Amino acid sequence: MKKALFIILMIAIGLSAMAQQKIQLRSTDKSECVSSDMNSLRATFSFSTIEAEDYSSDRGTFSWISLPNTVLGGEVGNPQVPVINELIAVPYGATPRIEVTRYSTTDYSLEDYGIKTLVPRQLPVRKNQNLEDVPFVMNEDAYQTRGLRSEPHAAVSVDGTMRGVQLGKMTIDPVSYDPVSNTIRVFNDIEVMVHFDGADAQTTKKMLMKTYSPAFDAVYSQLFNNKAITDV
């Protein structure tokens, strides 16, 4: 009996290992706002591990990869890749622009690690939806696209205001994917500089002082560059 249980346990462990794969990277996990003021924001991002899991669908079995401190990215139907997505405070009057100042690159053949073709990004599913009623979306053209980017794509935008704070979104793609060869290029040890061109420091401080409330400290703390607010 004990021998049978041991065999079952070993099979279960083996199946789990097959379903979950890891790629060890050369860096440690970091997502840090190094400095932030009315003129600019400097940040660094690095990753220690890529984790992958199998994803079964009516189109076959795909893989799903993730990096620490990232969210799901990619257009619906296109290969799903991890994305850095941070909410930032932007000074009033500023036109933000982002500059990638440093990064390293390493290419990985996913097949070497038992990782299958990356799953297409799917539409969000409501809690009350039946999964069987949700169609599987796959952009065939996107899966015929060859090539890897030479540098990480980065973007920043202004998205509105909250309690006197102008909000922006900083997005960085740390992974480029070639679905034809099933190869990824990981951009690691990324350093970016966000410039706040034309920032109106006086108006920004005035709005913060006018609308600040300790009740919203928990909300402010969610901002990537929250010290830019707490230090005013």
Language model feature labels by segment:
Residues 18-232:
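Extracellular pro-sequences of secreted precursors
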